[in-house]
Amino acid sequence: MKLSKFKFNLPSELIALHPAKNRDESRLMVVHRDTGEIEHREFKDILDYYGKGDVFIFNNTKVFPARLYGNKEKTGARIEVFLLRELNEDLRLWDVLVDPARKIRIGNKLYFGEDDSMVAEVIDNTTSRGRTLRFLYDGNHDEFKKALYALGETPLPKYIEREVEPEDEDRYQNIFAAEEGAVVAPAAGLHFSRELMKRLEIKDCQFAFLTLHSGLGNFREIDVEDLTKHKMDSEQMVVNADVVDIVNKGKDEGHKVCAVGTSVMRAIETAVSTDGHLKEFEGWTNKFIFPPYDFSVATSMVTNFHMPLSTLLMMTASFGGYELIMDAYDIALKEKYRFGAYGDAMLIL
C-alpha cells in the first residue's frame, strides 16, 4: 500500500478548533462493513448499537501538561520544550523535544517561569530536536512534578491553531483517564460523557481499561511512499489480567467487542495470541497497522476523523476496508464533519 493512497484535500475550516458543547453530542458517522451503509447520527446514539455483554475497551492513559515555554540563558531567547517522558526520577532527567533546536546545545541552561523559578540543563542530544534535560530543583519529587506541571500547558496538537484555553485542561482528557504518561489524548474516548457511560452500564455493557501512553509519533509525517518501510515510534503499554478476562469472555460468548480508538486497537493487536485471544502484556509497541491487515480481537471500532496521510487514517482504513473508508471520508467532507482530536466520530461496525 502506498502513502499517496491516503491523500485528500482537507479544508482548514473542517479542522475542529474546539470540542462539541457536550462530549456525547458530537456527530457520529456509522459505517456498516457488511452492507456498506452509512448513517448520520449523534454520538450518544451509540447506545442503539450495543447491548448486554458487549465489551468496550478504553485507553485510560492520562495527558500531562507537556508543553513549556522558557528562555535561554544569556541571550534570553524564547524557547519551547515539549516533555516526552521522565527518564530518571532521582536525577530529574527528562526526554524532551526543543524548538528552535539548532540554538539549544549541550551545557545550555534553560529558565522557566516568570521569576525563572525552574532551571534545566541540557545534558545530551538524542535526535535532531531531541534533548535530555536535567532539572535543577531542591524539593522532593512530588513537589518538583507539581512545580513543573504548573509551568506546562495542555499539549494540543499543532493543527489546532489557537492559544490553549482553560477548558482544554478538562476537555483534552478522557473522563476515565487514570494512568499519567500521554502527550496525546486518545481522542475517540473524548466523546464518552459520564452520563453515556452510566447508560451503557445500565444496558449491561462491559468496560475494560488498558493503558497505552500515546506519543507524538501519531503526528509524525511519513517520509516514504512504500508503507512497509515506515517505522513507528514505540509507545509504552499495559494490558492487565482484568482486561484479558473481560475481553476474552465477551469474545468467547459471541458479544461485540469495541476498540475505542486507534491506540486501543494498536494495543490489543500487539497483545493478541495466535489463537485470537488477548494475553497480558507490559512493555513497548511500535506496531504499524495499514491495509491489508487481519484483525483478531475487536469486532467494531470508534475513531475520530483523521488528518490526510496519517497513520491513524491507515489503521482506520485497515479495519473498515480501504475503499469504504475513503468513500466515507468523501461523504464526511461533503457533509462538513469536523476533523481532528476535537472533531466528530466514526463508528465502524
From Swiss-Prot:
Any Pfam family hit: Queuosine_synth
Keyword presence, Plastid: no
Keywords recorded for this protein, A-Z: Cytoplasm, Queuosine biosynthesis, S-adenosyl-L-methionine, Transferase
Alphabetical list of InterPro entries matching this protein: QueA, QueA_dom1, QueA_dom2, QueA_sf
Enzyme class per UniProt: transferase
Main location group: cytoplasm
SUPFAM superfamilies: QueA-like
GO CC annotation terms, alphabetical: cytoplasm
Catalytic activity: 7-aminomethyl-7-carbaguanosine(34) in tRNA + S-adenosyl-L-methionine = epoxyqueuosine(34) in tRNA + adenine + L-methionine + 2 H(+)
GO terms, biological process: queuosine biosynthetic process; tRNA wobble guanine modification
Task performed by this protein: Transfers and isomerizes the ribose moiety from AdoMet to the 7-aminomethyl group of 7-deazaguanine (preQ1-tRNA) to give epoxyqueuosine (oQ-tRNA).
Family membership: Belongs to the QueA family.
Quaternary organization: Monomer.
NCBIfam families in the cross-refs: PRK00147.1, queA
The protein's name: S-adenosylmethionine:tRNA ribosyltransferase-isomerase
Record lineage: Bacteria, Pseudomonadati, Bacteroidota, Bacteroidia, Bacteroidales
